């Protein structure tokens, strides 16, 4: 409510956080479009630049048969597709537009939920959603959000995701003329990878 939950005991890739969120909100599933947003240049000028989704596009995306070249790397129906066009290849349900309208017109509803977990499309995604659904709540002119994350990389992924969804709360609050409230993070399978152990030991010795 009175601060922003950005980790301070290690570096946070803030530009990547902002770029990925804008990419999701745009509804894109092309990794090269994310690169354009992140690096601020046209895709034919940044063919050597990588994003956090490049490896998924080059491996799982290729294995699924999606277009993959220097200027386009498709990932299948990942987050942006589910957020902005759920259910159909073209003209599906725009969950972002709907939830903004619902928050504005019926703020007390308990149905302010956006889901990326489309069971029918999971096997078509280069990476099934780790942060699967989020719910908004309005009270006392404040907008709060709870995220459920099915799979949580506690060292790298979770600080990134917390910052991303907290930024989303700030964006929605501005649109709806509300104040940012609380962000609540909930994890299912929470893990630290073996190759992160030493870094985690070092990080927990630091003071925020």
Predicted features, each with a name:
Residues 1-208:
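Terminal, non-catalytic protein-protein interaction segments that mediate quaternary/complex assembly
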């Amino acid at each position: 409510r009175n601060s922003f939950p950005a980790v301070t005991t290690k570096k946070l890739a803030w530009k990547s956080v902002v770029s990925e969120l804008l990419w999701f909100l745009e509804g894109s599933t092309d990794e090269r479009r994310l690169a354009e947003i992140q690096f601020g240049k046209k895709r034919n000028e940044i063919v050597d630049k990588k994003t956090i989704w490049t490896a998924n596009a080059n491996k799982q995306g290729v294995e699924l048969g999606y277009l993959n070249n220097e200027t386009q790397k498709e990932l299948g129906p990942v987050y942006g597709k589910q957020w902005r066009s759920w259910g159909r290849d073209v003209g599906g349900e725009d969950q972002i537009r709907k939830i903004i309208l619902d928050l504005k017109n019926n703020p007390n509803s308990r149905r302010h939920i956006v889901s990326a977990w489309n069971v029918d499309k999971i096997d078509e995604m280069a990476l099934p959603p780790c942060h699967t659904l989020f719910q908004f709540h309005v009270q006392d002119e404040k907008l709060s959000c709870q995220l459920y994350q099915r799979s949580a990389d506690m060292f790298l992924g979770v600080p990134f995701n917390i910052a991303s969804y907290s930024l989303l709360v700030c964006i929605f609050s501005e649109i709806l003329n509300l104040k940012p409230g609380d962000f609540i993070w909930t994890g299912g399978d929470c893990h630290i990878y073996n190759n992160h152990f030493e870094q985690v030991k070092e990080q927990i010795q630091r003071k925020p």
